[in-house]
Amino acid sequence: INWLKLGKAVIDAL
């Protein structure tokens, strides 16, 4: 799992 991409996706969803 790519945590940086996942984190960016979460931030973009906010």
Curated annotation (Swiss-Prot):
Its main location: secreted. Keywords: Amidation, G-protein coupled receptor impairing toxin, Mast cell degranulation, Membrane, Secreted, Target cell membrane, Target membrane, Toxin. InterPro entries: Mastoparan_peptide. The keyword Hydrolase does not apply. Transmembrane segments: none annotated. It comes from the Eukaryota. Expressed by the venom gland. It is found in: Secreted; Target cell membrane. GO terms for cellular component: extracellular region; membrane; other organism cell membrane. One of its GO terms (molecular function) is toxin activity. The modification Leucine amide is found at L14. Mast cell degranulating peptide. Activates G proteins (Gi component), which in turn activates the cascade of molecular events cAMP-regulated, resulting in mast cell degranulation. Belongs to the MCD family. Mastoparan subfamily. This is Protopolybia-mastoparan-III. It comes from Protopolybia exigua. The lineage of its organism: Eukaryota, Metazoa, Ecdysozoa, Arthropoda, Hexapoda.
